[in-house]
């Protein structure tokens, strides 16, 4: 029986059918089969799995896997799942970087131009202009300087914002004030008018934005979280908003998704809730990237470079 490529995850039959069609068109020499339709023999023989926010147990039920290709940039659900070294390939895609950078810029403008205040005033039928704050007078701090963070930094700089960036390890980027480590993070936070979280979720970044680090931000600063929910301690964020130390938070990711109806974030006047839409996967672009990785594997027998299991990205 010819080996198949497993497709694991997807949000229901409609998305599964869409992904299957686009991926199959990009890889005409491969036979992709959704996990739920695979026979026992196909599950035992599959060497490659393409995953979209999968149930880790389903991926672990493919004992012959040689490597796993994610259609998302984040792979935290898979790191540590397997009892053997297994390359996990996160999606590194120029189109995803472009759309994420676009979202960072859009919601930075939303905060810089006081849109939350004007929306509140409209509900109160209050006509009250606010002083204009130039982009050149606004400091944006980026938590994370990988492919997505670097693209966002470039877009913000081009728009005139002063950008500072933090990463776990030393990095340099032309025109960006960069820092790393615990000291570098605290040094950056004190300058931020807007803090953007775009860092992978790992054991080290879980709870990274806590009460102490929120307190280190400039009074009146705002927060954008486009990374993963657990990077920000929700209770600490709400306390900082309630005290007035933070002016607003734009949240696209949460500890539990979809965000439960009973969450206090829904009704909080200083929170904008988004349904995880900041960096959507463009399937045509992603399929081309995945197809190139798979062709290389078929030619060389070597899987692509995976995430560092110790770092989680």
List the model feature ranges, each with a label.
Residues 47-119:
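Phosphate/diphosphate ligand-binding glycine-rich loop within oxidoreductases
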Residues 169-264:
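Rossmann-like adenosine-cofactor binding region
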Residues 33-44, 56-59, 175-191:
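Short acidic low-complexity segments
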Residues 119-151:
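Glycine-rich NAD(P)-binding loop of Rossmann-like domains
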Residues 19, 90-91, 95-103, 117, ...:
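C-terminal helix-to-coil terminal segments
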Residues 164:
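Conserved beta-strand positions in the Rossmann-like core of class I SAM-dependent methyltransferases
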Residues 1-46:
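N-terminal glycine-/charge-rich "phosphate-binding" loop or analogous flexible N-terminal tail
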Residues 2, 136-139, 220:
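Phosphate-coordination loops involved in phosphoryl transfer and adenosine-cofactor binding
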């Amino acid at each position: 029986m010819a080996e198949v490529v497993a497709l694991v995850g997807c949000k229901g039959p409609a998305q599964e059918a869409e992904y299957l069609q686009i991926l199959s068109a990009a890889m005409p020499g491969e036979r992709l089969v959704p996990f739920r339709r695979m026979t026992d023999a196909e599950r035992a023989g599959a060497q490659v799995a393409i995953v979209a926010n999968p149930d880790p147990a389903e991926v672990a039920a493919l004992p012959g896997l040689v490597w796993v290709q994610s259609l998302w940039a984040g792979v935290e659900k898979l790191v540590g799942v397997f009892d053997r070294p297994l390359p996990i390939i996160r999606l590194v895609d120029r189109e995803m970087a472009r759309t994420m950078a676009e979202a960072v810029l859009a919601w930075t403008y939303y905060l810089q131009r006081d849109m939350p205040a004007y929306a509140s005033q409209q509900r109160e039928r209050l006509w009250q202009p606010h002083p204009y704050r130039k982009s050149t007078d606004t400091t944006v701090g980026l938590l994370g300087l990988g492919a997505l963070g670097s693209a966002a930094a470039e877009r913000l700089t081009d728009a005139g914002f002063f950008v500072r960036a933090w990463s776990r390890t030393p990095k340099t980027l032309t025109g960006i004030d960069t820092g790393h480590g615990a000291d570098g993070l605290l040094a950056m936070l004190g300058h931020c008018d807007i803090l953007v979280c775009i860092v992978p979720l790992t054991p080290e970044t879980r709870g990274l934005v806590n009460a102490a680090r929120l307190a280190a931000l400039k009074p009146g600063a705002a927060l954008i979280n486009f990374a993963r929910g657990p990077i920000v301690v929700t209770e600490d964020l709400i306390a900082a908003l309630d005290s007035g130390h933070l002016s607003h938070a734009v949240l696209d990711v949460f500890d539990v998704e979809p965000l439960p109806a009973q969450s206090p974030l829904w009704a909080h006047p200083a929170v904008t809730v988004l349904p995880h839409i900041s960096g959507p996967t463009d399937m045509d672009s992603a399929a081309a990237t995945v197809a190139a990785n798979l062709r290389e594997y078929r030619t060389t027998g070597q899987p692509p470079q995976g995430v560092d299991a110790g770092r989680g990205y």
